[in-house]
Amino acid sequence: MSITPERKQEMIKDYATKEGDTGSPEVQVAILTERITNLTEHFKIHKKDNHSRRGLLMMVSQRRRLLDYLKGKNVKRYEDLIGRLGIRK
């Protein structure tokens, strides 16, 4: 259900804008998307896990805020990111 440290480092390397970049919106959104995907799979089995569902909703909200921020700062980076992650149509 959680992301392994190796997977997290791989995602940081893939989405970082420069060396050592772990806090850029792109990296944060990519990690949140992975966590959201994992939790979505969890809920297919555990439908009544409302405690974790609240955490999922908080993650989705955080990702939305980060995407809104990125869209306001740099639309090109926003469009590239959603294209790479496949989270918008």
Swiss-Prot record:
GO biological process, any: translation
Keyword entries, A-Z: Ribonucleoprotein, Ribosomal protein, RNA-binding, rRNA-binding
GO cellular component: cytosolic small ribosomal subunit
Keyword RNA-binding: yes
Pfam families for the chain: Ribosomal_S15
InterPro entries registered for this protein in UniProt: Ribosomal_uS15 (IPR000589), Ribosomal_uS15_bac-type (IPR005290), uS15_NS1_RNA-bd_sf (IPR009068)
An example Gene Ontology molecular-function term: rRNA binding
Location of region: Disordered: 1-23
Sequence ranges of Basic and acidic residues compositional bias: 1-21
Known partners and oligomeric status: Part of the 30S ribosomal subunit. Forms a bridge to the 50S subunit in the 70S ribosome, contacting the 23S rRNA.
HAMAP family listed in its UniProt record: Ribosomal_uS15_B
Known role: One of the primary rRNA binding proteins, it binds directly to 16S rRNA where it helps nucleate assembly of the platform of the 30S subunit by binding and bridging several RNA helices of the 16S rRNA. Forms an intersubunit bridge (bridge B4) with the 23S rRNA of the 50S subunit in the ribosome.
Family: Belongs to the universal ribosomal protein uS15 family.
Protein name: Small ribosomal subunit protein uS15
The gene coding this protein: rpsO
